[in-house]
């Protein structure tokens, strides 16, 4: 068998499964933590500062290192990135919008960057404890003394647990094309999911599953206020509706606009231009 014939035949098998996104159309990559319900089991509830910071830093690094990325959004254990390839007529798409390469590399990047970021967060937290300068407790840390977060907050058990699992996090990824008109709607969809996750997380912190059974989001908010005296609207914005990443182009004198993390994004349905200006 001639080597050239073997090579050609094998390449045909490989090529037949390739898929490409549509050029000159926005692309969205979303990475999700694999089995993060288990991964986050021993973290501070209802929200873990170090986990949240690590996710935001992962988003930042991905925005900085993925060609054509113009906007990032993260909530819970997921990151959504918006890519464009039409800034100029000669602008190239990231890996020619090869879906296999986009998803495999994006998942690998998220896994690596998250491990690095979480390690940095845990190490910094341990140093503060050693120096007897613990980070300020979250607004939930002392609400219920019998809750898991009260037991592990500021405790070496928490640090040991985090260090044991920091390199166990894995991410999957998907990539798809969307019309320009739908990019904002896609981010609205994810932000609405963030709001739902946030309300449910706080509800689960204070109430049992049976108490929350069949309760709507508005009913959970009412329970939080009437029974726990907690106003969900007073929670920090990044815990209610996620965080975003984009270039700071306010100073036109700069040669390169730096990427920044916005921890207090607006409600997207009320300010569509917040996203659409980048598309």
Residue ranges and their predicted role:
Residues 1-279:
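Regulatory and interdomain segments flanking nucleotide-handling catalytic cores
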